[in-house]
Amino acid sequence: MSLGLLGNKIGMTQIFDESGNIIPVTILKVGPCVITQVKTTLNDGYNAIQVGYGNVSTKALTQPQLGHLQKSNIQPLKYLKEFHVSDPTEFNVGQILNVESFVAGQLINVTGKSIGKGFSGLQKRYNFARGPMTHGSKNHRAPGSIGMGTSPGRVLPGKKMAGQLGNKTANIKKLKIVQVNNDENILVVKGAVPGKPGNLLSIIPSK
């Protein structure tokens, strides 16, 4: 069962282990999440639970979104996401999920949006080598040739060129949980996770 939760990135810091080694860690505020819908193979074609996170005013939601939550008598929630489960009968609508489903030493996958860095050139975006800086060269950071001539007479799809860098979904796999704080719903994981502090994250156990 890969039960996932939603949360926010708080920021990075460092802690010391028993041997005195410094471990770079990220602090995550995870849940509490509310189960807003349970899907089964019989009714929906697959087994999953829909999880809601982040209390919000009713004015911030559309009528269909409000109706979906009010049908289950659940308070307005900002984010909804589905997670596949093997046995949906273990869950009930309105059930609260928190970090108690995770333990220290467990490996998790964290998904979120990476930091957007705007329109970037090839050196920054793809680590391309630059051109000569001297001897009369006028090609310092230019892309160079982007294709052949008459045949095929076009730029091939997928050609690496300058453009938007970041602000895309990034998935970091097998991050190790260092500490779990059940009272504050805090996870401390080794390493970095996508995005800036406050970024919405999806956390699921690694397979």
Curated annotation (Swiss-Prot):
Keywords: Chloroplast, Plastid, Ribonucleoprotein, Ribosomal protein, RNA-binding, rRNA-binding
Assembly: Part of the 50S ribosomal subunit.
Official protein name in the record: Large ribosomal subunit protein uL3c
Gene3D superfamilies: 3.30.160.810, Translation factors (2.40.30.10)
Keyword Ribosomal protein carried by entry: yes
MF annotations from Gene Ontology: rRNA binding; structural constituent of ribosome
InterPro entries per UniProt: Ribosomal_uL3, Ribosomal_uL3_bac/org-type, Ribosomal_uL3_CS, Transl_B-barrel_sf
Subcellular location: Plastid, Chloroplast
Role, per record: One of the primary rRNA binding proteins, it binds directly near the 3'-end of the 23S rRNA, where it nucleates assembly of the 50S subunit.
Family as reported in the entry's similarity comment: Belongs to the universal ribosomal protein uL3 family.
Primary location class: plastid
GO BP: translation
GO cellular component labels: chloroplast; cytosolic large ribosomal subunit
Gene designation per UniProt: rpl3
Phylogenetic classification of the source organism: Eukaryota, Sar, Stramenopiles, Ochrophyta, Bacillariophyta
Pfam families membership: Ribosomal_L3 (PF00297)
